Amino acid sequence: MITIQKYVRAQTLEEAWQLNQNKRNRILGGMLWLRLGKGSVNTAIDLCDLGLNTIEETEDQFSIGAMATLRDLELHEGLNAYSGGAVAAAVKDIVGVQFRNMATVGGSIWGRFGFSDVLTVFLAMDAYVQLYKGGIVPLEQFAKMKKDNDILVRLILKKTPCKIVYTSVRNQRTDFPVLACAVAYMNGCYRASVGARPARAMLFCSEKSEGFASFIAENAPTEGNLRGSAAYRTHLIKVLVERAMKELGGM
């Protein structure tokens, strides 16, 4: 169980950032993963007063606040029209509606969890994160970065024309994925992200569809855990990428 000594609702990002420089302080998202931890938090920092719970759409991008929920992603008409329903498909099996009403986009992306459907689907698209001090960083680069004491302000999705398919395999519907996969065709290039390896999602790109699935299966490191073996995950990579590419019309 985690214990919190003090709770602060930050009134500015600067205040939140200053508080977050203390290693014993933590920023709260939806509090769904953090509460499962152990130890003591000196100050819990809540960003709920900073207006980061919206999804704003312009002609060329979506700006998704860190405190927007997974349910907001699931129901946003513009976002799902752009992605052909791939974003909704990525989050629909994450536990249940009550959970998705509380889990935040910022927490899901910042955590860079190996099991993250959210990271997997956005990694295949033209996505960026805005960090308070670090500025705007491509999501592919952010996914490889070590965690620090910066603050994720929002996720930015450019409306670069693309077709995308999301698919996953689960042992049961609301469980973590055994393997997650998103494949997009954008700017004449296939972009495939593979998550739940069970490590962080990885992105692969190729101009050719032939042999792409086999290449990813051969080069994406996998490991075994209670949900599946490394060999099973490697097999799933090839199968899921091929299925997604057929749906895109690339095979």
Locations of regions flagged by a protein language model:
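C-terminal structural segment of proteins
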Residues: 1-251
